[in-house]
Curated annotation (Swiss-Prot):
UniProt similarity note: Belongs to the SfsA family.
Protein name, as recorded: Sugar fermentation stimulation protein homolog
Secretion signal, residue range per the UniProt entry: none
A molecular function GO annotation: DNA binding
Organism: Edwardsiella ictaluri (strain 93-146)
């Protein structure tokens, strides 16, 4: 995935109200960015880090610039815009770069399904195989080289795991896809210390046949690309 317009850099002053961040541009001007990531963002929003942002010419936007990436003072690259994760996974599957789910001829996004009125991120279909339901999760919480998900208690994420279990029980494929968007993460675990119920449901889902995939990414201001599979412990 290439950014459609060149990103600009600034220094992070603070993130606040979940959706906003103040940054200082190289010319000294302070501007406010929109932050699409509503999670805890632990370790991803340290004042003094370099942030990279995109800008929109849409006059209806109150905050025309969006926080896309962080380059930490430790040298790690992080994709802050969680909306990018679905695009990255879609692109990689469409280009047949994810071997575990290759061979499907149709990809649909945001399809309603399940008993709890959910929308699946990606639905893969082909005439010669069962449908494949894929739920995408962005992983950015780094602790001792390990990535953890979730970074906060997520009832929505718990619901998604229940829905995926039901899909497997109905006879189709279901996949939980961890897109690791932090260059310092080398493997992923369920964050039992943050959301024990989510970790319990993930282990249960895996035992029932929900597939868990995990891929790292190459991240820089030009673009982001899913690259290699990473180990994941449920």
């Amino acid at each position: 995935m290439q950014f459609t317009t060149p990103l600009q850099s600034a220094i992070l002053i603070k993130r606040y109200k979940r959706f906003l961040a103040d940054v200082r541009r190289p010319d000294g001007q302070i501007i406010t960015l929109h932050c699409a990531n509503t999670g805890a963002m632990t370790g991803c929003a340290t004042p003094g880090d370099t942030v990279w942002y995109s800008s929109s010419d849409n006059p209806k936007r109150k905050y025309p610039s969006s926080w896309e990436l962080t380059h930490t003072q430790a040298g790690d690259w992080i994709c802050i815009n969680t909306l990018r994760a679905n695009t990255l996974v879609y692109e990689a599957i469409a280009q047949q770069r994810i071997g575990e789910v290759s061979g499907y001829t149709k990809i649909r996004s945001e399809v309603r399904y399940g008993a709890e009125n959910s929308r699946i991120d990606l639905l893969l279909q082909a005439e010669d195989r069962p449908d494949c339901y894929i739920e995408v999760k962005s992983v950015t919480l780094l602790q001792s080289a390990c990535g953890y998900f979730p970074d906060a208690v997520t009832e929505r994420g718990q619901k998604h795991l229940r829905e995926l279990q039901h899909q497997v029980q109905s006879g189709v494929r279901a996949v939980l896809f961890f897109a690791v968007l932090h260059s310092g993460i080398t493997h992923v675990r369920a964050a039992r210390h943050i959301d024990p119920r989510y970790a319990q449901l993930l282990a249960q889902a895996s035992d029932l046949g929900v597939e868990v995939l995990c891929y790292g990414a190459q991240i820089n201001p030009a673009g982001i690309r899913l690259t290699q599979p990473l180990p994941v412990t449920v």
